[in-house]
Amino acid sequence: MDADLDTLLADLQRRMDGAMETLKREFSGLRTGRANPALLDPVKVEAYGTLMPLNQVATVAVPESRMLTVQVWDRGMVNATVAAIRDCGLGLNPQPDGQLIRVPLPLLTEERRNELARAAGKYAEGARVAVRGVRRDGMETIKGFEKKHQIGEDQGRDWADRVQKLTDATIKKIDELLVEKEKDIRQV
């Protein structure tokens, strides 16, 4: 039966880690005071009749702490790329220079910092909800084992305690990521 527990815990851990990775991806799209190429990950460019991620039509680099550069591979894509960056909702003003697009990052206002911190909180809460959903699935699996008399009540409680500890540890990591991201956002 320990093999079943190990399999269950490994599956739950994998799913909880997936929620953490999603949270990290969402956090990388939130603007902080520093330039980060991942900031432009959500940008989609109209290319060849379809919407394509920016990283499939250009290279993003960080030459300075408050500047991104976007090197477009196809000269014909420069205007579409500039428009996509301008319209992505991050308040950026791209400046084309041949095939190179400079994207200066303006200072964040206090109001914008608060909005970003709230968005980070919402993302973290979404991750917590996902982790609790995984926990619920694990608990239901344990109850199913108990009903089928594959494990006893005591063993079921032990398994449930281990699932709860896994959940608590993952939620603690989520909270730590949130504190770190809020610190980055509020840093002037």
From Swiss-Prot:
Keyword Nucleotide-binding: no
GO biological process, one term: cytoplasmic translational termination
InterPro entries: Ribosome_recyc_fac, Ribosome_recyc_fac_dom, RRF_sf
Transmembrane regions listed in the UniProt entry: none
NCBIfam families associated with the record: frr
PANTHER family, alphabetized: MITOCHONDRIAL RIBOSOME RECYCLING FACTOR PSEUDO 1, RIBOSOME RECYCLING FACTOR
The protein, known as: Ribosome-recycling factor
Organism: Acidiphilium cryptum (strain JF-5)
Gene, per the UniProt record: frr
